[in-house]
């Protein structure tokens, strides 16, 4: 099994590197935790979980420069295309094979409006992604609260690694994220979407203690710019 390098870019942004490079929710400009500039990123694929600016981020600018493939919910894809960049829309429950990487769109409990130029556009429905790459299954939950079908996601796709928000207020907090881990039962979980701004400040060590007191799942607390290998 060939490895996958995973780098946290702060907030909910991750770069997955194998034969191809997959960039998730590239909120770089305006992200105080970002360890790089948008110009340093040259992905083959971008996935966007929903339309909020801290997830859509620099997708359009990076897409224009690199001509990478962009995969997102249908309505966000239409918005990106309106800016002169091609994007591919898909729906929840569907799977696409992109450059040898299988992407399955899952549900998420959140919202997805796109605020730009003083207007709010319909961003459809928020989502998460199951990413099957080089024999590994990874679940990026997007912005979400905990929901019962996370157990079904765990049973169907058996993700060995889960990327979960813990920031509270706009997503689930530590208590709810711990329950999500109990439902999914992955081998490893990485917390995300916390402490980017004061309003979502959380202690990831508290999350680590809560999870490891409940289940046999390893919690890896990453620093922005840090990488791990699967």
Swiss-Prot record:
Q: Which HAMAP family match?
A: UPF0173 (MF_00457)
Which Gene Ontology terms cover its molecular function?
hydrolase activity
Domain of life of the source:
Archaea
Q: What is this protein called?
A: UPF0173 metal-dependent hydrolase Mbar_A3716
Read off the InterPro entries from this record.
Answer: Metallo-B-lactamas, RibonucZ/Hydroxyglut_hydro, UPF0173, UPF0173_UPF0282_UlaG_hydrolase
Entry's family note: Belongs to the UPF0173 family.
Q: Say yes or no: keyword NADP present.
A: no
Q: What is an example of a Pfam family matching this protein?
A: Lactamase_B_3
Source organism phylogeny: Archaea, Methanobacteriati, Methanobacteriota, Stenosarchaea group, Methanomicrobia
| Keywords of this entry | Hydrolase
